[in-house]
């Protein structure tokens, strides 16, 4: 059984899987809007066979403190990654981020370039997009007009392909009950969504010189693949992985395909 270390820094719950980490490359995983480090369960075996892996719950979510600083932005998310690295004594880490977590990784590359080794951005974006805004507006209406139960019940529609939702109905209903019980305060979720809607680093993409893997699903119903294509085309040192099926959360629906590309990228020169 691999060693796991659990800790808290400035209200952020984190877990280190594997160790010791001295002299080793480390992978830091950053989740999407939901914020839970448990999102990465389908990647853990493939990664921990090779590297120590850090997961954490975003500020305001999961087991982390359930409040956010005023005027919350993606810069705060990037700063929180640095706090987790500092707590573990890491000079830098490979960062793998899904959507919001990938965007925070891009912000980290700009704000703290020396703390980032390689970066993987899954279904992310660099500037506001009309379709993303439409989806988030719908989520906001569900949350504000109906409540967390309706918000959570609708999430699979944004995240997964229809056939996968049908096949995994029992699993999704069990997860739904858990997500409703653990749902963040309304003001936290509103602030996180508004931070993502305000995120715009498009004019600075050429300043990010790190090795980056942009990974995208063609059938993502939340983030158009054109957003990932734009990232891959404008980042000076980016690789691009496109999968045909799997939805916004294809790291969950087709982990084998994603994990193979992820490991290959992180192991490469």
Swiss-Prot record:
Pfam families: Abhydrolase_1. It catalyses: carbamate + 2 H(+) = NH4(+) + CO2. Keywords: Hydrolase. Its EC number is 3.5.1.-. NCBIfam families: RutD (TIGR03611). Belongs to the AB hydrolase superfamily. Hydrolase RutD family. HAMAP family: RutD. This is Putative carbamate hydrolase RutD. It comes from Caulobacter vibrioides (strain NA1000 / CB15N) (Caulobacter crescentus).
């Amino acid at each position: 059984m691999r060693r796991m270390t659990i800790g808290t820094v400035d209200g952020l719950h984190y877990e280190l899987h594997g160790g010791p980490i001295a002299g080793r490359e480390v992978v830091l995983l950053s989740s999407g809007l939901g914020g839970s480090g448990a999102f990465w369960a389908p990647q853990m075996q493939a990664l921990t066979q090779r590297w120590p892996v850090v997961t954490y719950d975003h500020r305001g979510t999961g087991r982390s403190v359930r409040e956010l600083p005023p005027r919350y932005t993606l810069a705060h998310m990037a700063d929180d990654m640095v706090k987790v690295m500092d707590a573990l004594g890491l000079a830098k880490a490979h960062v793998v981020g899904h959507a919001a977590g990938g965007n925070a990784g891009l912000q980290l590359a700009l704000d703290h370039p020396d703390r980032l080794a390689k970066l993987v951005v899954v279904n992310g974006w660099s500037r506001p997009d009309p379709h993303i805004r439409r989806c988030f507006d719908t989520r906001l209406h569900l949350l504000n007009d109906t409540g967390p139960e309706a918000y959570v019940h609708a999430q699979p529609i944004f995240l997964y392909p229809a056939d996968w939702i049908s096949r995994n109905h029992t699993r999704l209903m069990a997860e739904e009950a858990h997500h409703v019980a653990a749902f963040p305060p309304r003001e936290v979720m509103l602030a996180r969504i508004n931070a993502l809607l305000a995120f715009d680093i498009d004019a600075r993409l050429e300043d990010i010189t790190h090795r980056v893997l942009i990974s995208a699903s063609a059938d993502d119903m939340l983030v158009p693949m054109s957003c990932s294509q734009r990232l891959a085309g404008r980042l000076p040192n980016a690789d691009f992985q496109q999968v045909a099926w799997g939805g916004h959360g294809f790291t969950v629906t087709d982990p084998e395909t994603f994990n193979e590309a992820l490991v290959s990228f992180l192991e490469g020169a």
